[in-house]
């Protein structure tokens, strides 16, 4: 068992000082946390620096913090930002370590059993181990995670009790160390030295911890005493440092000692016998035979190796839990007094709420047909109510908080002011009758000012027809939809900014996260047709596209004002009034964002995310054959570097770009 270091404090390193209403938001959130408030909401408009605000809160309250994002890409970006803000503290990354994952499943209609198949990303596995070991060693830890953090993980008490602690001068037999390493799932391999392995050379044992990627440990013995512990480069063997003490954490999160393993196996056998009786009494002889054969094989592997593929399905017995008890998760590795931040909570909370039911349905089929014991159902994600029980104090972060968050707290901390002084756009409603002719007049006004226009429609057909009609009128227009490939989409956006055309028509432009400061008008056609594309949140997000321009304006064409429209307009007007008052008080003149236009291939999936950029000196079709080959090699290198750096959005963009460029040859 190791002791957690609690004296470390968070230190925020930034050249920026809180500005606008950031200081007030920080102070209110900090007071809430220190005052013991269970839940708070940070309602921050796009572009107001919500991550910087949360970083200041973390520094002030000085609590271990878990930040949950709704996908790996966003988690990776937040991880990068927090690493920059807290270079001296432990900023960790915890997401699903599968590059590819096909869960175990059974389809009764075709009698098809699908075996679990997966590809584990070694780099992410290392980072997961780094996260759990940091949480057990120190207090100044920020873990950025995806929703996968609510899935079952090993017992943190067992995990910490299995830590092998080594000190210089400690009496220990070399073979005793080797046995201890094997017990915590390290593998001996004197040739292929990788994470989770060790090798032996006389009185020297070299250990490659699961949480590291470059430096291994060299433990030198003198008789039955540890004489020296050094850090070495795992590839070259070069000595990079020396230490007096080191803690070696298990190579897997599902680890248990021999005594617990035997007890777990006896419980598995008891459950197997009881389940076989049930299946045979129901005349399910095939299912009984299948279950007996599979389970006995797993038991034999656990006895001989201490591990088996799919051991997580027996986690209830390994952890000593009762039927129905929640599994251990990453949240159990945190001390009781931790801070939880839910980013983009209006998307993340529904994900957390829905995880359990989908997992349960698949596993129930495996149990019913004899592929797994009923205890496999307890290898699962947390239910929402179980997740809530783990929460000490929580901050929901969103520009458009969902109903769940609003039910949890009345404390809504607003962050409306942008550092640029830009306002939320003016919103106007006009009748649907004659909407196109009216829009054409507005477009001409914008073209005279060298500004651009977004038009959102409800259907792809309408977008195409409107594009054709505008072209007949001599307007320069293009349309954007999901069928357009990444490369073509980004070229369209670039051409819009360059003024090669003036109007971009789309169906769900907010999903593209388009950031074009030149856009001063957004026209929302058929705004009164209730649905996902015209919900309050979608409308607020769409209106936000015009908040990059000092003359930003939104026109909604509608014959009636729906509840969603009214709420979206009220919220936008409320924010605009706050921003105007602040600007007047501080003498700030809103200025359109000046953003360099490059010849580039880029994609930005949400408004708050940075653009992913690949620079091209000239159009691809104008390159020579050798230049094309060189470019593709360069992009492939950048793709691999981005993946290694966990910048998955960049890597995915580069992958798509490479495929499209190859197809364009």
UniProtKB/Swiss-Prot annotation:
The gene is uvrB. Forms a heterotetramer with UvrA during the search for lesions. Interacts with UvrC in an incision complex. This is UvrABC system protein B. Residues 629-664 form the UVR domain. InterPro entries: Helicase/UvrB_N (IPR006935), Helicase_ATP-bd (IPR014001), Helicase_C-like (IPR001650), P-loop_NTPase (IPR027417), UVR_dom (IPR001943), UVR_dom_sf (IPR036876), UvrB (IPR004807), UvrB_inter (IPR041471). The beta-hairpin motif is involved in DNA binding. GO terms for biological process: nucleotide-excision repair; SOS response. GO terms for cellular component: cytoplasm; excinuclease repair complex. SUPFAM superfamilies: C-terminal UvrC-binding domain of UvrB (SSF46600), P-loop containing nucleoside triphosphate hydrolases (SSF52540). Its main location: cytoplasm. It holds the Pfam family UVR. GO terms for molecular function: ATP binding; ATP hydrolysis activity; DNA binding; excinuclease ABC activity. It is found in: Cytoplasm. The UvrABC repair system catalyzes the recognition and processing of DNA lesions. A damage recognition complex composed of 2 UvrA and 2 UvrB subunits scans DNA for abnormalities. Upon binding of the UvrA(2)B(2) complex to a putative damaged site, the DNA wraps around one UvrB monomer. DNA wrap is dependent on ATP binding by UvrB and probably causes local melting of the DNA helix, facilitating insertion of UvrB beta-hairpin between the DNA strands. Then UvrB probes one DNA strand for the presence of a lesion. A motif (Beta-hairpin) lies at residues 97-120.
């Amino acid at each position: 068992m190791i002791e957690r270091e609690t004296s470390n404090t968070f230190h925020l390193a930034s050249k920026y000082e809180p500005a606008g209403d950031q200081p007030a938001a920080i102070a209110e959130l900090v007071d809430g946390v220190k005052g013991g408030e269970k839940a708070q909401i940070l309602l921050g408009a796009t572009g107001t620096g919500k991550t910087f605000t949360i970083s200041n809160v973390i520094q002030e309250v000085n609590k271990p913090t878990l930040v949950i994002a709704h996908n790996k890409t966003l988690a990776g970006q937040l991880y990068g930002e927090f690493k920059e803000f807290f270079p001296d503290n432990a900023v960790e990354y915890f997401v699903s370590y599968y590059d590819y994952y096909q869960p175990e499943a059974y389809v009764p209609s075709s009698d098809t059993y699908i075996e679990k198949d997966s590809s584990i990303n070694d780099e992410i596995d290392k980072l997961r181990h780094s996260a759990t070991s940091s949480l057990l060693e120190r207090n100044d830890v920020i873990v950025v995670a995806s929703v996968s953090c609510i899935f079952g993980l090993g017992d943190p008490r067992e995990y910490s009790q299995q830590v092998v602690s080594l000190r210089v001068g400690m009496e220990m037999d070399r073979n005793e160390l080797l046995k201890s390493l094997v017990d915590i799932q390290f593998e001996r391999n004197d040739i292929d030295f990788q994470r989770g392995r060790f090798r032996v050379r006389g009185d020297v044992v070299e250990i490659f911890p699961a949480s590291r990627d470059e430096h291994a440990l060299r433990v030198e013995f003198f008789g039955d005493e540890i004489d020296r512990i050094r850090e070495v480069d795992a590839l070259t063997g070069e000595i990079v440092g020396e230490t007096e003490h080191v803690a070696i954490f298990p190579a897997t999160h599902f680890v248990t000692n021999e005594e617990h393993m035997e007890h777990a196996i006896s419980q598995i056998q008891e459950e197997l016998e009881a389940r076989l009786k049930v299946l045979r009494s129901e005349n399910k002889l095939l299912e009984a035979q299948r279950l007996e054969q599979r389970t006995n094989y797993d038991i034999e592997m656990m006895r001989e190796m201490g591990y088996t593929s799919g051991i997580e399905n027996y986690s209830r017995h390994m952890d000593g839990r009762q039927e129905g008890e929640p599994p251990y998760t990453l949240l159990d590795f945190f001390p009781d007094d931790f801070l939880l931040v839910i980013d983009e909570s209006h998307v993340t909370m529904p994900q957390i709420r829905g995880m359990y039911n989908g997992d349960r349905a698949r596993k129930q089929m495996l149990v019913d047909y004899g592929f797994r014991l009923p205890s496999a159902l307890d290898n699962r994600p947390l239910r929402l109510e179980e997740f809530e029980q783990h929460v000490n104090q929580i901050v929901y972060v969103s520009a458009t908080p969902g109903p769940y968050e609003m039910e949890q707290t009345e404390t809504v901390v607003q962050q409306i002011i942008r550092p640029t002084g830009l306002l939320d756009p003016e919103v106007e409603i006009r009748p649907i009758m004659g909407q196109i002719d009216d829009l054409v007049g507005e477009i001409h006004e914008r073209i005279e000012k060298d500004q651009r226009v977004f038009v959102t429609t409800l259907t792809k057909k309408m977008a195409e027809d409107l594009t054709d009609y505008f072209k007949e009128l001599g307007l320069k227009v293009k349309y954007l939809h999901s069928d357009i490939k990444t490369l073509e989409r980004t070229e369209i956006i670039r051409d819009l900014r360059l003024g090669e055309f003036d109007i971009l028509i789309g169906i769900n432009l907010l999903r593209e996260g388009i950031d074009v400061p030149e856009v001063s008008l957004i026209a929302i056609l058929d705004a009164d047709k209730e649905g996902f594309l015209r919900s309050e949140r979608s409308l607020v997000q769409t209106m936000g596209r015009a908040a990059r321009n000092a003359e930003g304006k939104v026109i909604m064409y509608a014959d009636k004002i729906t509840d969603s429209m009214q709420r979206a307009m009220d919220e936008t007007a409320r924010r605009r009034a706050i921003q105007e008052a602040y600007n007047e008080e501080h003498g700030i003149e809103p200025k359109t964002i000046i953003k360099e236009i490059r010849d580039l291939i880029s994609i930005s999936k949400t408004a708050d995310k940075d653009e992913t950029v690949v620079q091209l000196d000239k159009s691809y079709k104008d390159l020579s054959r050798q230049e094309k080959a060189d470019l593709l090699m360069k992009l492939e290198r950048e793709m691999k570097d981005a993946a290694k750096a966990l910048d998955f959005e960049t890597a995915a963009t580069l992958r798509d770009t490479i495929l499209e460029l190859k197809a364009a040859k």
